[in-house]
Amino acid sequence: MRFKGLDLNLLVALDRLMTERKLTAAARAINLSQPAMSAAISRWRDYFRDDLFIIQRRELNPTPAAEPLAPVVREALLHIQLSVIAWDPINPAEFDRRFRIILSDFMALVFFEKIIVRLAREAPGVSFKLLPLDDDPEELLRRGDVDFLILPDLFMSGAHRKARLFEERLVCVGCSTNEQLQGKLFLEQYMSMGHVAAKFGRGLKPSVEQWLLLQQGLKRRIELVVPGFNLIPPLLSGTNRIATIPLRLVKHYEQTIPLRIIEHPLPLLSFTEAVQWPALHNSDPGNIWMREIMIQEASRHWNPRPKVVRLKRPRSFHSRSS
């Protein structure tokens, strides 16, 4: 098919080049030879009268003229798939797809493990690429470079649809042998004790409790920063440090690590874990099927949900804590 001199089959090649950023990998992904992929690039360059890609550090980086094309090309291909190709109902036993999902280490451990176990039985052809929290997940969603984002919903963009998974609350926790935690924990003591805190991404984005403390103008004595929640419980063991972490994470570790939950001196609010997907994938049958699986598993394991006070969305996802 051609449109104003452009072979629309080249859309697939351009989409893959934008995703892979490597000529050989892109060619292999769509079963083209490297010379054929090079020819496709040449034809795109002639069409747009622009280099489109510049080689930097062995990668094909889009030029300013090419960068806006990525979401447009991806959306065009998805519309063709959804409008022209007849989709059969998803048969889990025969479904073959890899989903790319951004989520925290905490959610991978306490929630997504259940998805993996279930689909290993029901849909063995489904695989996953679990990705750490990115500094700009909204941009990845906009381009359709990831299939799902699992986060507290207060950190999510309003530009894409989302679905609630479950409510979570934060608790203060320390080692069971910590003598400073024998009685009630007052705010002054909480602020003066050494804390272990999690931060995410290369930009060290704050976690939920850090954002809440920042909103109240409170500054803890953070003695140890780790790249995720799951490292915190083991690093509290045998120390006098404390941390503020999700309750489900404490429950996961309480049989193997001597932990003590203390009533928090602050009225820390509960928050909602949610799943979000690109607007480009709203009608994608595979994406719909996968999101329904996640919602089912969250409902099956964590109902009824407690009544909570909802946090407002922070002004910036990139807020930093001191």
Swiss-Prot record:
Keyword Methyltransferase set for record: no
Origin superkingdom: Bacteria
CDD domains reported for this sequence: PBP2_NodD
GO molecular function terms attached to this record: DNA binding; DNA-binding transcription factor activity
Domain HTH lysR-type stretches: 6-63
Keyword annotations from UniProtKB, A to Z: Activator, DNA-binding, Nodulation, Plasmid, Repressor, Transcription, Transcription regulation
Annotated PANTHER family: HTH-TYPE TRANSCRIPTIONAL REGULATOR LEUO, HTH-TYPE TRANSCRIPTIONAL REGULATOR LEUO-RELATED
Family classification: Belongs to the LysR transcriptional regulatory family.
Protein's recorded name: Nodulation protein D
